[in-house]
Amino acid sequence: MDKKLVIAVDDSRHSKNAVRYAAGIHEVLKDMKFTLMHVQPTISEYLLEEAKKSPQAYAELEKVNRKNSETAHCLLEKYKEQMMALGIAETDIQLKTQPRMLGMAKDILEFSMAGHFDAVILGRRGLSGLQDVFLGSVSANVVNHTSNTPVWLVDEKETSKDIMVAVDGSENSLKAVDHLALMTAKNTDIKISFFHVTPKLKDFCPVDFEETQTEALEEQGID
């Protein structure tokens, strides 16, 4: 059964990284269909309101809409050509663009859920925590708002096709393993590693032990 993935893109190197990674992982994860999606820029609220009253403003709004749509289609065609150059069949690539309605992250998630996609792929900007607070991040917002749609975040210079799954026995961890099983079913050419970090006593105990006391308890097997 084909797996459906949506790659949310803009005109940035981070999106280029996501497209390149998706094409590369296709070598080992077979039967994948891709949809390249671009959410168009926000249109001025003033222009939207004026367009309801003024024919001139309405004409200007139509002009802006056409420009945004043309720019989006050119961008998507460029990424489509890149994926085809990396070995993806043209029939396995669909294009989708739409005006921004709910917000960039929510529009991406709404589209992915409505289309029953198996995952969303995005390039990650790699902002620090402080930068993320002030500037925001589409990838961070997608992760924060998703409930059922798996999200793949791609960093720069991501070349490995092997997969590592960090597990801790939680429900979300089991969901990640379930998603991995779905995506890798019947593929024997991929290496999967499961990684678990054993917690220390201080990670979950509210008592403020001295470091020597903690070490002594851990040596006795209380960790």
Task: Please report, for each region that a protein language model flagged, where it lies by residue.
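Conserved phosphate-coordination/catalytic loops
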Residues: R13, E70-H73, P99-G103, V133, ...
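Conserved N-terminal ligand/cofactor-binding loop architecture of enzyme catalytic domains
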Residues: A51-Y58, E62-L86
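Conserved residues at the C-terminal ends of beta-strands
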Residues: K96, G123, A166
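Structural beta-alpha unit
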Residues: M1, P41-S44, E70, E77-V120
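A structural preference for short, hydrophobic beta-strand core positions in alpha/beta folds
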Residues: L36, D92-T97, L153, F194
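Gly/Ser-rich helix-loop-strand patches that form or flank binding pockets
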Residues: K3-K4, H14-S15, Y21, E27-L29, ...
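Small/aliphatic-rich secondary-structure junction motif
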Residues: M1-L61, I88, K161-I222
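Short, solvent-exposed amphipathic alpha-helices that sit
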Residues: Y21, T71-Y79, D107, H179, ...
